[in-house]
């Protein structure tokens, strides 16, 4: 009898282990060990101040949701509210930068906002509310999205509603500065369900992406002037690099059913062509001339996985990621890998409406 009981226990343990294994996302588990404190702070160790950004917190929340890791999601959310939003994301946008000051105090280093982190945070909260059936997340996400619309969206003559990179420092009387990587088209589509200004922003965001890449390479930053339009031949060379790499990744993650995806892929085809020809994405490209220099780091290769349509070219970048997987001191490369490789491994997809389609599996639906 004891032998039978022992055998049954062993079988149950093996079954439980197999379910856990099916639910585990190894890259996410390693990211938590290397980059997230027990309290829920996503740390960038490459900076001497051991900084945390609202971007990092938002990417952590997205990854936790995609991994069905509710405990991590709650920790990251709680730390963000308590340390970046003075206790409530309903009442204020999160400060974008937190870390160690010269006097050794740990606190907010820059209270300005960063809309790339803000929109991912709002979207992750809204989707967490839907998928985990938790009204609290929905309420916080809705309030945050309304605050983004009030504090970070402006009306630009000749364009319409546009998302500023932050609430302070990007708008002058007749000039506005934008970052094309800050609002992924999939999120822009998702937010249209909330009405103005998001219905307009989806269209103007498409213009930002399509009209600022004359040679097929998106700029990290670009300026728009009243009556003059996009300033693509600025005094200072416009570069496509560490910010813009996300543009190609976001475009690649658009569902094939989105009628704008083919147009976007075609606009940025030179980036795909360069990567296919050379075996790696460029680190920097002159937006005006299309001249590339340097070899992009491993995170760039991960970001290209959703974007590349050629399977052989995908395989080359997939192998480059596997051979050079980010370590414990490469925050940005790692988050790009969570997105790009995670998508490539079918750990998540996005619907035509911009909703998350996680690959939790039926047996994983309640695992946190």
From Swiss-Prot:
State any GO BP term from the record.
cellulose catabolic process
**What Pfam families does this protein's entry cite?**
Glyco_hydro_8
MF GO annotations:
cellulase activity
The superkingdom listed in its UniProt entry is Bacteria
Q: What is its subcellular localisation?
A: Secreted
What are the protein's UniProt keywords? Carbohydrate metabolism, Cellulose degradation, Glycosidase, Hydrolase, Polysaccharide degradation, Secreted, Signal
The positions making up the signal sequence are: 1-21
Could you tell me which pathway this protein works in?
Glycan metabolism; bacterial cellulose biosynthesis
According to its UniProt record, which reaction does this protein catalyse?
Endohydrolysis of (1->4)-beta-D-glucosidic linkages in cellulose, lichenin and cereal beta-D-glucans
* Entry EC number(s): 3.2.1.4
Q: Where is the active site?
A: 55 (proton donor), 116 (nucleophile)
The terms describing its cellular component in GO are: extracellular region
Q: What else is known?
A: The genes bscA, bcsB, bcsZ and bcsC are constitutively transcribed but cellulose synthesis occurs only when DgcC, a putative transmembrane protein regulated by CsgD, is expressed. Cellulose production is abolished in E.coli K12.
Free-text function comment from the UniProt entry: Hydrolyzes carboxymethylcellulose.
Q: Which family does it belong to?
A: Belongs to the glycosyl hydrolase 8 (cellulase D) family.
Q: Which NCBIfam families match?
A: PRK11097.1
This protein's name: Endoglucanase
Q: Which organism is it from?
A: Escherichia coli (strain K12)
């Amino acid at each position: 009898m004891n032998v039978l009981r022992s055998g049954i226990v062993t079988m149950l343990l093996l079954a439980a282990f197999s379910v856990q294994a099916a639910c585990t996302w190894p890259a996410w588990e390693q990211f938590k060990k290397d980059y997230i404190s027990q309290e829920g702070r996503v740390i960038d160790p490459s900076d001497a101040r051991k900084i945390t950004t609202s971007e990092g917190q938002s990417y952590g929340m997205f990854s936790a949701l995609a991994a069905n890791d509710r405990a991590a999601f709650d920790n990251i959310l709680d730390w963000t509210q308590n340390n970046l939003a003075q206790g409530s994301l309903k009442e204020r946008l999160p400060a974008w930068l937190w870390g160690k000051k010269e006097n050794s105090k740990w606190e907010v280093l820059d209270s300005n906002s960063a809309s790339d982190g803000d929109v991912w945070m709002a979207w992750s909260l809204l989707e967490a509310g839907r998928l985990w059936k938790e009204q609290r997340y929905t309420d916080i996400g809705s309030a945050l999205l309304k605050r983004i619309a009030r504090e970070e969206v402006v009306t630009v003559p000749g364009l319409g509603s546009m998302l500023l990179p932050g609430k302070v420092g990007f708008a002058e009387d007749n000039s506005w500065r934008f970052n094309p990587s800050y609002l992924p088209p999939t999120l822009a589509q998702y937010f249209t369900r909330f009405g103005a200004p998001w219905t307009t922003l989806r269209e103007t965001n498409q213009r930002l992406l399509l009209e600022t890449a004359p040679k097929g390479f998106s700029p990290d930053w670009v300026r728009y002037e009243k009556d003059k339009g996009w300033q693509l031949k600025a005094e200072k060379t416009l570069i496509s690099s560490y910010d813009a790499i996300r543009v190609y990744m976001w475009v690649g993650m658009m569902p094939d059913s989105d009628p704008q995806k083919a147009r976007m892929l075609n606009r940025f085809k030179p980036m795909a062509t360069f990567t296919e020809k050379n075996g790696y994405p460029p680190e920097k490209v002159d937006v005006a001339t299309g001249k590339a220099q340097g070899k992009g780091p491993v995170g760039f290769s991960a970001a290209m996985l959703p974007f590349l349509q050629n399977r052989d070219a995908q395989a080359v970048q997939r192998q480059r990621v596997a051979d050079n997987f980010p370590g414990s001191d490469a925050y940005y490369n790692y988050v790009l890998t969570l997105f790009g490789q995670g998508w490539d491994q079918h750990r998540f997809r996005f619907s035509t409406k911009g909703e998350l389609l996680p690959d939790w599996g039926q047996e994983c639906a309640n695992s946190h």
